[in-house]
Structure formats: structure tokens, C-alpha cells
């Protein structure tokens, strides 16, 4: 539709699988599953619900008569009761026991939890794929020296693969958070208007033991281990905040990754994928802009800010419930998951297609490494009997002169030639070139990468060996 606003997260960025989870069809089919679980639990606990009624509900769990529900909602202005009515039209024998003892939050809140849980499983799957892709990259480039940067100024070299482990480590931390959230997932259950289960105590004629069993049965039928032990009318809105905090952390990790790629692309050391017919600029035809990484950064900023919504909502809920959560969470929660889905698709796409330019990396090392090697050069000369303080002064003078050539004349770094021509050092240019072999300055970076991949990453990937390997397709 060209005359109606559509969220770009749905129309442009997120995958079909994630979009379906937050669709009306998913929501209303889950409502029906919950009504079936409630009726079946009530039947098993001895309430006047028959197997015939339960079977009738199950027979129409999927074929929702949306037109009937929508017409009814225009009349009664209540979405839950409209769908109770529509379900009852299809299930006349069960119409009288649909939603028995429940409140709107029984279907609404439990459905929200189920959808968020399933959405988090998609996030988990894609996080694992991000880690898998980056592990291949780190393994391939674990030995390739490159300049490290602190304050975005050249620093002691690392390796391209070791740098990738830093990105991976943050995504692994995020995966731990996702796993923790999924490990403690629980439903609201059916606790009534203020969380006291008064309606069920009435249905069971004051039998506390029977009323207390309803939640456990519902949880089991819906595939959960438990429900919240206590609640008001709703599940604690802090759950939404915790969920979106996890997504915010993923966004932070992705933004860090994308910013590094953008800077590396500026240096022409590493580039994100660039399609054969892709246009970087409408005016500057030669440009290769890192638009995927820029989109990651843009969406990440949105998620980090969006995560404030449920935090503020949770902190401003009154007593057993207020409705000022509803409109906000209808927007903030789905959009956060859709944006995270989009980000992880982009990270997979970028990481899987990174292009490394070793010759450019080598050129940058040649320009900077002589300065970093001067301490080793001084120590070698001192061991041969030269005065350390004189050596230091000569290095300082030569370094300033070489730096001037680079910065003011645009020339190459000639520090090694200056040192070779200075008799105080007593060393040839060939000997100096051996001293400044970049592999000698990366410390334990290659070994650190190997250990990290074997001891930290491999156990995670082995645990998720059955996780489907994805190749992300994105809209440019």
C-alpha cells in the first residue's frame, strides 16, 4: 500500500519468521491454544467441562473466523470478548465454557510471554550463526599482523583474527544473557483480576488445593515449566525490561562491530561486501560506502533507546495494574525484536562477506612499525656497549625527522635508513628489517586466538551443532 504508513522494520528489514511471531494471526491462534489449555485443565480438575467441548475447541483452534470477531469488536469495543464470541460461534457446544474463570490478561499476557520467548529463540539462533561466521574469519586471519589502535592512534600490533575475537566475545556474552532469559521463562498463568485467583476458588467451591493446581496444568500444556508464583493482574512488567535489556546489549555489540568495520573500510584494510552493481553515491560514482555497517549502527541506536520504554513502564506501574503499559508495549516490544532481527541479519551478511586487504595492512605496518621497534633497537645496541642515554637521544632525533618527512612531505617512513646510517647503533639496514618483522610484535595474539576458538567458542558451537546455518539476505 502506497497511501498508508508501514513500519520499515516490517516492510524492509526484519525476516518473515520474526514478523509472523508479532502478527495478529500468531496472537489470536495463541489465544485459542490458551483457551483450550484452560478448558482442558478445568476438565481434568473436575469442573463441568466435557471432553466433547474440549475436542470442539481443538477442532477450530486454527480456522479463526476473523470477520465475525472484527464485526463484534466494532459493536462491543473489546478485543478479547469479541474473539470469545467468534470462537463460540464456531464451537456452540463449548461456547459457555470459553474463558471460564479468566480475565483478559490470561490470554493477552500469556500470549505476550509466549511470543517474546519464541522471538528470543530466533535471536539465539542468529547469534549462534554470527559467532560461527566470525569464528571462521578469526581462524583464517589469526596470524595476519595488523596495527592495533588505541584512541584510534597506531598502537602495538595485533592480528586481524585476534581483533575478531573481541567482537565474538561480546556476542558470546549476549548469548549467555539470551540463554539465561530462556532458562527462566515462565507464564503468568490464570490468576484473576488482581492476582488472587478468587474466581477459581469460587469455581472450586473454596477448595484451595484444586484452585492452586490450575497454573501448573496450564503451564505444562503450553510447554512451560511453571508460572509466576505471585502476580497482580499482569505479569511483572520488569520482564519486558529484562528482555529488551538483552536486545539492547546485542545492539551494543553489533554497533561496536559495525563501527570498527566502518573505520577499517576508511583505512582500506577491511571492507564489508559490495554488490557488483551497487551504487555508493548518486554524485560520486567511485564511492564504496559501508552502508550495511551504517545501517547496523543506526538500528542499534534505536534499540538502545527503545529499551528505555519498558524500563520506565515497569517503574511506573501502580499496585495490581494500570493500563498505561499497553499502548507503549504494543509498539516498543515488537519493534525491538524486529530491529534486533534486522541487525543480526546484517551482522551475518557483513561478517560472512568481509574482504581483507593484506597489502594495505602491510603498508600501514611499514609506516608505523619502525617507531614501535626503536626500543628493541636501542636494547640491542646497548647490549653491544653503546650508552643507553645517547641511544635514546639519537632515536628521538631520528624519529622526529622521519615523522616530519611523513607528515609534512607525504613521504615514506625512512627511520630505519636513518638508524642504519648512524654509527652509534652499529647495525645494517637488512638487520633492522629483520628486527621489524611484524610477526615479532603481535605478542600472543595468534595463540590467544587459537585458545579462544578452541576453549571458548568451540564448546558453544558444539552445543548448537544442530542449529540451522543461515545465509542472511538483506534489502539494500
Provide a role label for each language-model segment.
Residues 139-161, 271-287, 320-327, 352-372:
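Glycine-rich cofactor-pocket loops
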Residues 162, 241-249, 376-384:
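Short, well-ordered beta-strand elements within core beta-sheets of diverse protein domains
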Residues 174, 225, 232-326, 330:
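Glycine-rich anion/phosphate-binding loop at the beta-strand->alpha-helix junction
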Residues 38-41, 123, 127-130, 134-137, ...:
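Amphipathic alpha-helices that form helix-helix packing interfaces
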Residues 271, 394-401:
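Active/binding-pocket-proximal capping segment
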Residues 19-23, 68-70, 278-298, 320-335, ...:
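Short beta-alpha connecting loops at secondary-structure transitions
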Residues 1-198, 204-219, 280-281, 291-295, ...:
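A helix-coil-helix interface module used to build multimeric assemblies
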